[in-house]
Amino acid sequence: MQKVNKKTNQNLKDIDFSKDIILDNVSYTYAKKTPFEFKALNNTSLTFKKNKVTCVIGTTGSGKSTMIQLTNGLIISETGQTIVGDYAIPANTKKIKEVKRLRKEIGLVFQFPEYQLFQETIEKDIAFGPVNLGENKQEAYNKVPELLKLVQLPEDYVNRSPFELSGGQKRRVALAGIIAMDGNTLVLDEPTGGLDPKGEEDFINLFERLNKEYKKRIIMVTHNMDQVLRIADEVIVMHEGKVIAIGSPFEIFSNMELLTKIEIDPPKLYQLMYKLKNKGIDLLNKKIRTIEDFAEELAKVLK
């Protein structure tokens, strides 16, 4: 683990939140000292790199969702520390200074965020976060039409009730509310769960755009390996409360021993490549993300 200057008491307005987010030897236990005690994280460390898309994978109960909640202080580690842009949150910290600023910069989107909508209009729901953090109310409201456009909803939806929308539309509104806070990092827990294929594609396109055009760091927990292959710069593999592997999607998905251990099937393209390998055509050492990449590499081999 890299050495970090601890600045626990530094004013958060002085922190550069674009720097790496480091979880250093962190642990977390649910229902401590009860018959239901469960150690979700067990003295593990990792880094979420600047301007990267990082996907976190692993079976249910491996610690993925617990780990991402440490990034913005929603929960506090029992050991080690969480470091955000040189700002250290030591284990068992009771109160984080200026926690609103921290949560502005690191926006956490839970699975099924549409259940967090509560305002009477879409405009008020999207503007709620920025206004709550001190932004001028009119300025926050003025941004809403552009945010609706970004998440592919009509701009004239501003005065509609969010409860009139479909599930997928509600999720777009909820995501727009997080983006409205204009933080450096989006932390997403199963963001496309329950969406139809068109909705999934729209969301993945949006995350790619937020990373490439808006320079947002994206941290995404998902069980959808096709999405991981499509979007990830780096993949973190969790198992029984620990990080057991970190690598590019190409490195992770070409390691069948690892995938078998964590009981995860590779993306569909890699399933096809494993079948081809059994037929004597090995493409697993190629950096293949899309069906177009696959066709190009296969054509080279078959020439």
From Swiss-Prot:
Main location (coarse class): membrane
Alphabetical list of CDD domains matching this protein: ABC_cobalt_CbiO_domain1 (cd03225)
Keyword ATP-binding: yes
Residue ranges occupied by any ABC transporter domain in the UniProt entry: 21-265
EC number: 7.-.-.-
Free-text function comment from the UniProt entry: ATP-binding (A) component of a common energy-coupling factor (ECF) ABC-transporter complex. Unlike classic ABC transporters this ECF transporter provides the energy necessary to transport a number of different substrates.
Name of protein: Energy-coupling factor transporter ATP-binding protein EcfA2
Source species: Mycoplasma mycoides subsp. mycoides SC (strain CCUG 32753 / NCTC 10114 / PG1)
Taxonomic classification: Bacteria, Bacillati, Mycoplasmatota, Mollicutes, Mycoplasmataceae
Gene name of the encoded protein: ecfA2
